Amino acid sequence: MSLDRLIEKIAELKNPTVAGLDPKLSYIPDFIKQDAFRRHGETLEGAAEALLQFNRGLIDALCDIVPAVKPQCAYYEMYGWPGLRALAETIRYAKEKGLFVITDGKRNDIGSTMEAYAAAHLGEVSINGHPFLSLIHI
């Protein structure tokens, strides 16, 4: 989704809210965690599956109300590769539902490195960064 389309969606919904997807495992309802752990064990895979299922429910509930979501990378990265898969699947699902996605990675580096972070973040998705350091090499 382009920034122009995001602006149109904000006007259409009359809502500029960006919903944060910061799925700390302790925030997730027990029935979701229990189902994920039953299928994958109390492993990184189980935790990541719980994050993904929780996010899908939130996205389903919010997609007609808000124009954008902002998954916080740290809550996914802490679960290793399974967590990164959950982040990628969350982003894919949000985009399927018509939401603009801002990856909250709070990366903090110079412009060329920020370009690499941006390229790494799963295609047509925005990522936040440190504006001062990013401008040093422009």
Where are these regions (language model features)?
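Short, acidic/polar
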Residues: A50-A61, M114-G129
